[in-house]
Amino acid sequence: CVTYIYVGTPIERPGAQPQLQLGDRMVDVSQLSALVAAERSRMTPAEQQRHLVVIKADRHIPMSLLRQVKDALRRAHATRIIYTANDKKR
């Protein structure tokens, strides 16, 4: 089971604050822990062991935001994380 989180500024609003997208919806970092925990609760114990979170982030977002995301995932017991970064044209 894989959960995808996208972090970056919206394409249609360059210069705006970075936002989080969990699956197909926009979420606030304060909601992330509860949403991921709810997703994990629907999994079997075997699936929870294999659960992987992929964070795809804009290379230019603040590291403090990624730290908040990582802390939220830790609270949801989602500790298998892969980070990828992309260079958006500014």
Residue ranges and their predicted role:
Residues 1-90:
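Long, low-hydrophobicity, acidic/polar, solvent-exposed interaction domains
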